[in-house]
Structure formats: C-alpha cells, structure tokens
Amino acid sequence: MSCRVYPLLGLLLASALSPVLAAPATDPTSLLRDVRQAYGGAQWNHALALQADGKETGDDLSGPWQMLVDLRSGQFVSRMRNDVFSAAEGTDEQGRWREDITGLVHPLDSDEAHTVGVTENWLRRFGFLDAHSPVSYRALPDVQEKGHTWQRIEATPAGGRSVTLWIDPATHRLDRATWPSSFLVVTQHYGDYRDVNGLQLPFRIETSSANLAGNSDGSSVDVVEHYKVLDAAPTTELRRPDGKVRDVTMANGARTATTRLRVEGGIVLVDVSIDGRPPMPFILDTGGHAILTSDAAKLLGFETKGNGVSGGSGSGTMSTSYTKVHDTALGDAHVHDLTYTVLPYPFGFYERGDGEPIAGILGLEMFERFAITFDYDRDELRLSPYDQGEAPAAVKGDAVALRFTDDMPLVTAQQDGHAGTFGIDTGNAGYVLTFPQWAGSNGISSRYAAGLPIPTGGVGGLFIAHVAHAQQLVLGQQRLDNVVAMLTREDAGATGNPSEAGNIGQDILSRFNVHFDYRRQQMVLMPRATTPEWHYGMVGFRAEKEQDHADRFDVINVMPGSPAQLAGLKQGDAIVAANGKPAAKLSFGTLRDMSAHLPEGTPLSLKLADGRVLEMRARDMAPR
C-alpha cells in the first residue's frame, strides 16, 4: 500500500478526534491475543459460516437485510430491500459483484476493486481472529477521543488494502475499522455485542463513507435480529444472481430501438419518454444512474421517498430521494418499473433556453440491459436488448476491455507515455481529466499544474483546475496527439480519485462512433464517416443562469489574460445576448458551443445588461 494513504486518513480522522492524545503503541501480538479470547477463542474453530438476519436503514428507508458469510474463504452475499428498491452484493468463486437498485448485476473486477475486496472480505469473516491468516500487523499509537482511550492496529491482508482497527481496551473488542476505498474513506462501527453459541458478535453495524474533504457520501445501519452459526460452508447460496434481463419489452417486434441523440456543449442528450408522455431530453451517462431532476419529478407527478446524499465531481454532495417509474422508453425499447434517484439539480443544470429542459440522467441501468451504439454521424442512439432471443451481435472496430471498481466502466489507456486506469464517462462534457495522485507518481503533474486555471465541477460543486495540451493519449489502438487534459485536485471527489489515472469523456469519445457491450465487457471505437476536426480555441469565461432571471447569463469567472478579459468582460457582468441571439433562448450548452472548442479566431459578440457590446475572438490558451 502506498504511504500516501496515511496522510489522507489523518486529515479525515483529525477532525473526529477532539482532543487527540497519542500514547505509546501496544504490542499487536499480545493485543490480538486478548481480542481473540474476548471474541470466544477456540469456539471459532467450529464455526464455518455465519448468517445474519435483521433490518437495514439508510437514506431514511428501512427493510429486511440478510448477510451470509463463509468464515474460511470470505465469500459472502448481502441482500436488502425496502419500500422502493432492493440491492445486493457479494463475492463468489468468480469474484466481487453488485446488484444495483434496478435489479441487474455487474462485476467489480478492477485492480482497486480486488484490493479493497480482499480487505473487506477479511473484515467480514473476522479475519483478525484467525492467527493463521496471511496478514501483516503494525501497532499504532493509542489515542484518546472524547475521554475514551482506543488501542489501534493497522492490518494489511495479503493482496489487500491497509485497514485501521480501533479496539476498546476495556472489552478487547473491535469498535470500528477505517479504510480507503477508491476516492472515499469507509468507516464501519460495531456495537451491541452479544453471545451467540459462545461467540461474541455485533448486533449493530453502522457503515459510512466520506470523501477526502470530509463530506458524507452516505451511511447505513444494519441491526441484527438473530445470527445462525453454521458448521458447513454454503456454496449455492453464495452464487451471484443470473443477471438476466426480465423487465424490457420491445415494441412493434423491434430487434433494435433507435432514438435521437445530440451533443450540446459536450453534453450527450437522448430522447426518453416517461410513462407514455412526449419524449424529453435525458443525459446518457456511463458514469451515472437513473435520475430525475426534482423539477421533472414534480412536473410528472411522482411521489418520492427517502433522504440520502450523493457525491460526484467536486468535494460537495447533494440530497437524494427515490421514486419508481412504470415505463421508461427510448424509441421502441421499454424498461418497466425502474427505480430513479431524484436530485435537486440547480436551474442552470437543466434549463435549455427555448429548448425543452433536461429531465434527468440515464446510466448504468441502460447499459446493463442493452448493447448501445452512439452514432454521432446519424445523430442517433441504437439499443439492442439482452436476453430477447439472439444476443446482440459483436461489432467490428477497435475493442477496448472494460472493468469496474464501482458503476463506471474503466479502461487501460496511456497519457504522455504512462499507462493508467481511466474512467469512460459519456457524461463528461469537458476535457480529459487527469487525477493529481497518478500524475504526481508518474512525474507529469508539473506540466499540467502550470497550465491555464479554469473553473470546473459537477454535483460536488465548482473548483479551479488547470489545463494543458497533452503530448499524446492512447486509447485502444487509437493514438491522439491533439488533446487537452485537465489536472484536477486531490479533494475533487470522484474527479480526484487516487485509485485511477483520469477520466475520458466526450472530448475523445465523440471523435468516434462508440459501441458499448457490457455482456462482453467491451467498448468498441469505430471510425466516423468523416474524421472530425478538433479545436481548442476559447474566449475564456464561465456563466450560468438563475431561475429568477432566466433572460441572462451571470458571469461567474473570467480567465486571466483571456480574450474575454481583454475585451472587458468581468465577473458579475450579465450577458443578455450572444452573436445576436437572446440569452433567454440559449442553454448553457449552446453558449458553450459559441465560446469554446472553436477554431482560433472565431468571433463572439456579447451584449451585456449594462448596454456594452464586447467583441472577442477565440484563442487556444492551453499551454503546449
């Protein structure tokens, strides 16, 4: 495990320990001996598996929960359901897997998923009670937290991630465990220990995660009603669900469905009909899930349940709730009874001037049900269903293998001669993202850190990043030398992920026609009818609309030395027209198309609310 994790953990833990007083470290061998005795000692020799049944509460929703664990291998399955959705996850002989809240399964098979999975499986099977488990221990100084002393051990299972165990010296039982997982830090608290057949087992397990800025990314509480100690390891019960699609129908006997696709300011929009209503624009995002904006959910008359949080690009989070949609249709493809998350996106996210507002996002659940082709030449999206007779045919082209740490597909690509794991994110409307931890470890961060400062962000809020021309990007067999990359920040949430190299979005993907086939775990890049020219000229500002004055864009950032600044544009100015088109009729995306990714010298005229008219010409400002 890289030593860089320790200061990150320290940042998070420091805020929780008030005050913190370090004491000499306790010898781990003697401490673990006491722990093993406190948990039941030799009684564990006769336990081969555990089954826990109870209730899970999360996002203000509750329902039955069950977990089955093989205490020797660490294989497990955990299932929950509530009034809105069900979900499951596990490890079987094939590896880690997850069943999402829409009922379909995908593997968690990246290097990061494997590393984290080894440690989580070790914890789940109480691996610290196994004196023969292949794990290294390191004593950490005792700490005091709110008047209570905790003994701590850092444990690193073979092939796994280091985890800090917090032990109560009065009971010699585990109070909590903390470990990094992707861009989050996970904390699991154990309490309400009781005797079960001579074993001391926790009847309350609280799991929470936070990003590196310390903002919550969700939590759940599992309350065990009863345990079963099994003297035989389960096999069939631990296997993942078959993953067969049972909730899709194709109208008119269609084998393939087609719907309109367009790209607006780098944002991929597709037409989607909800419960038979006229089609509305949705973002199709491999890094996303089925989401309705709060405004769309209200307009469509959906009731919501639950109250959670969601993170993303940036360090902040957003509140969430849930609803069920009877029919989601993309052309002739219909998905029935799909669970949607409802998010209170701001007006500037969904407003499209004189166009229909963006109603939401579709993501993982579509790619699990269909092989999907983004045909940018024809401005259409094609969907071929799984498990409807003959499987979708393989597509010819440059096939790139996909893997998963979470729900976004990952590929191996190269930037500036260095290989790394990159997210494939059709919802990324901007530049290639380069994550600072990976860039630093490969010696290329200074090149980008000296680049143009530029505002960016998403669900987690805005932050300043830096852009520069990359030397080269290699994706599959494609070598691209006209690419601008953006160096993000370590505290940028999912876009500052220490386990990945970066994120590839529309700036690269739309240079090809792209086919996704999750059953084959591949993305296929196919040549466009005409090779598109790519430009990085910009005028250098960012502006957003507010609902109470939708007839103008408020300028929130002007880049130093940019054509916009030289023309006299300032933060706080209000744009009422661009190239003669009223701002009321323009979306964020269309204004972006008029002000960025342009050939150098492209003119832009901005009329401001104070009567000024500013003339400027696009310039490629990213250093080479």
Question: Predicted regions: what is each one?
Answer:
Residues M1-R4:
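N-terminal secretory signal peptides that target proteins for export/translocation
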Residues D59, Q66-D70, G117, A158, ...:
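Pepsin/retropepsin-fold aspartyl endopeptidases
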Residues P7-P19:
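Bacterial N-terminal signal peptides
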Residues A23-R33, G95-V163, P169-T171, P180-S181, ...:
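Flexible, processing/modification-adjacent segments and terminal tails
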